[in-house]
Amino acid sequence: MWKYILAAMTLSTPVMADESKITKGYNSMDAMGCMLVRECKNDVDEVFSLLDISSQYDNTEEFTSVAAEFNTMLMAMNQIGIKVFLADQRYFPIMHRGVYHTVSNNVYLNKRYMNQPHILMQLMRHEGWHAAQDCMAGTIDNSMIAIIKPEDDVPMIWRVMAERTYPSHSVPWEAEAQWAGRTENMTMEALQACARGSMWTEYKPTPLTYKWLKENNYVD
C-alpha cells in the first residue's frame, strides 16, 4: 500500500577522486553512484550561490533574472541540510540532467546542461521538489519521499508527461515534480516550509501520508 505514497529513491584523497571505483565506464549508473556516495569528487563542485554556476558559462549575465529564486531555494536547502553540486557530465548517464539523492541529501546538476537559465531553473525546482517530498515523509534523514499535493491537483499535462517518461511506480512523485519544475516559486515555498519546520501545517498531508507520519511519531 505504501508504494503509492512513499518511495525509497533507488534513488579519495583531498585532491584526486577515487574514480577507480567506476567499473562500468563513465556516463553510466555506476559512475553516477560513485558521485552520489561522494567517492568520486573530482570536478564535482559545491554551489554556494548562482554565480558558482553562471560564471562557468559565457552568458553569465543572462542568469540575473533567476538569481533571487535560485539563491532563495539554495539557502532553504542549506538550512535543511541539503547541498547542491555542479558536476561534470561524465558522472551522469546520457541525457540525465540532474538528481536528488535521498540518502546523502544532495542535489547534483549536470554541468553539460546548465548553461541556459530556464533549464537550470527547471532542474533546480524539480530536484528541489524531490527534496521537499523527502521532508514531507517525516525527515530528510530517512530515504523515503511522499507526495505533497493531492494527485487530483496536478495538472493533467504533467501527469501525462510523467507517465510517458517514468516507470509507473514513480509517476505520482514525478508528476508533481514536473509541475513544480515549471512553476515559479513553487519549490522555493515548499523548501522554505520545510526549513521552518512547518511542512505539515502549510501542506496538508494526504490521508495515507498522514497515517504514515502518525504511525512513525512525526505528528500527534
Where are these regions (language model features)?
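Sec-dependent N-terminal signal peptides
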Residues: Y4-S12
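Auxiliary, metal-adjacent structural segments of Zn-dependent hydrolase domains
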Residues: M35-V103
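A mature extracytoplasmic/lumenal domain signature
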Residues: D88-R90, K111-M114, C135-G138
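Short pre-active-site segment immediately N-terminal to the catalytic Zn-binding motif
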Residues: Y108-L123
